[in-house]
Amino acid sequence: MPLVLENAELIAFIPVSNLQAARRFYESTLGLRVTDENLFAVVVDANGTMLRLTEVTDLTPQPFTIAGWQVPDIDATIDALVARA
């Protein structure tokens, strides 16, 4: 018997303090496509995984990464991101 969520699509929730600034960063700097938007969240497609950027009123930064990408050349990727920022 398959697991309940075995074939379900994952959507990750990322808290942000400024929804429009986050949208600009994920769309313009990271190059992700916006798939949905409302007053409370913006959803971007990260190569098939949906990231829901959700505005929260009391954002407490954490000392760990909440999302990461595996890339073939980290130095080239950093250079490309810096050039877009």
What are these model-derived regions, one by one?
Residues 32-72:
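Conserved short beta-strand elements that form part of the metal-binding/catalytic scaffold
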Residues 19-20, 67-85:
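Vicinal oxygen chelate
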